[in-house]
Amino acid sequence: MSTTRRTLLKGAASSSLIAAMPSIVTAQTAATAATVAPARANVLRCVMHADLASLDPIATTASITQYHGALIYDTLFGHDSDAVVRPQMVAEHKVSADGLTYDFTLRPGLAFHDGSKVTAKDCAASVKRWGARDGAGQHLFKQVADVSANGDNSMVIKLSKPYPALLDWLGKSSPSVCYMMREKDATSDPSRPITEAIGSGPYMFNRAETRTGSQYVYDRNPNYKPRSEAASGFAGGKVARMQRIVFQNMPDEQTAISALLAGEVDFLERTSPDLRSQLAGNNRVRTEVLNKTGQIGWLRMNCLQAPFNNAKARQAMLHLIDQKAVMQATYGDPTNYRGCGSLFGCGTTMENDANTAWFKGGQNIARATALFKESGYDGRPVVIMQQTTSPVLSNASLLLAQWLRQAGVNAQLVPLDWAGIVARRANKGPVAEGGWGIFLTWASGSAYNNPITLAGHAATGDKGWFGWPEDARHEQLRDAWVQAPSVDARKKIARDLQENAWNFVPHAYLGQWFDVAAMRSDVKGLIGLADLVPFWNVSRG
């Protein structure tokens, strides 16, 4: 099979996206009413990696929705550039001597975009909603006895057992971030996306100027009071220097490159190597790797349905994938990528080589074929949801289908944009009922380092993240890891986790790559985070 290193894709917004966001073009609030358009110099136009399919950063782990959340919401805590957790909306906090009670006092002057005051009731409800949905939150809430308000400005979390990572999880920037919402939004079912977008963060969502599938507009919140500290990582003062931020949807990368060169847009989150050459030598633009930990592509299998409800079929996927071929198909230059066999990602603290003979041995179609046979595979269709809006995942899907067919599997590609995948991956049923067999996605390289905060590291069955693997030993080891007294102790448990995981196989990896962003030369102040692109602190000129 011949695969090019670039897949250019065009398309309009899907009907599933429109259905997911029914109020975007109809609902209005005082905070988002149409305003006089700011001067072009005060607007940052950004082309992101995907269209915004959902407004709810708790209901979905989609990275683009987390970016949206970072603009309009705020958090109780955040990690600075040295990975130290710092207070954000919190003025001060106290922990009882036994480690079971946490008391948080909010900063004065916090207000939502609709003018209402941020209260401890809002925060308590937000923490509960996050805890019911997020992987780290679910793990934490196994030890939470109560979360409640103690007056307007104080929130109390009571634990049944000490949990050393509580503040870290409240301040993490990996999906899903623990964003603070209004109580009336936060008390809704966390599995059903909210359609309101009213937070207390540095930018306000402008529904009047938003065009679903085309552009999403955020205006500076004139009432936001940033912290006095300098911006650092996901912490410090979130200063909205630009009057307006616009997420511009441009699926065709050549169109986006041309728009950047013409000054019609200011920032491209990702550029492919073959198109990036058009930017070389042009002093009006520059490129930068913002996420130094890279991205790791992975595939999730529907562990509730055959054939992947059998561990043998999942083991087959480890032997089936040639990570170098997947990366070569899109990135070409090997300096842009590498293979990775560690459950915890490569270049991370917890990286290890336990139980990686399958990776060191390279692709083995014959072994994969034998394992599918041992699993009892009966020839039924295995649907691969091919993400058409990502060149690397689209190319990987094509290769994966080819390799599965070589292993005797009836692989069927179903092309979908990201919004379509987000909608369909929630279906736990068989293919005949709209289900699926495999979908491909990615996460920041740093996200894999932590077996608690990455939702896909859980093995809690149908209560967990899409794919729904289940393994009791894995969950016991995750519990032990979070309670471990030192980094060295965690590293030892990480080896045990990986040894066990590559036997039951919760997912499989496609390789690790390093995205290069491009921007106009006058764009200043971008903060490089591993998990999202924040746009506070950014200016032009």
Question: What does each model-found stretch correspond to?
Answer:
Residues M519-G541:
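Long beta-strand-rich cores associated with HINT superfamily self-processing modules
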Residues P226-Q278, N410:
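Ligand-site clamp/hinge motif
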Residues H139-A186, S191-R211:
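Surface-exposed binding/hinge segments that line
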Residues T212-S214, D252-E253, T271-P273, Y337, ...:
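Ligand/substrate-recognition segments at binding pockets and active sites
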Residues A37, F359-G362, Q412-A426, I452-S521, ...:
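Extracytoplasmic/peripheral linker and loop segments enriched in polar/acidic and small residues
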Residues Q278, L304, F308-T348, N395-A396, ...:
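Periplasmic-binding protein-like
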Residues V47-A97, A125-K128, I198, Y509:
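N-terminal lobe/hinge region of extracytoplasmic solute-binding protein
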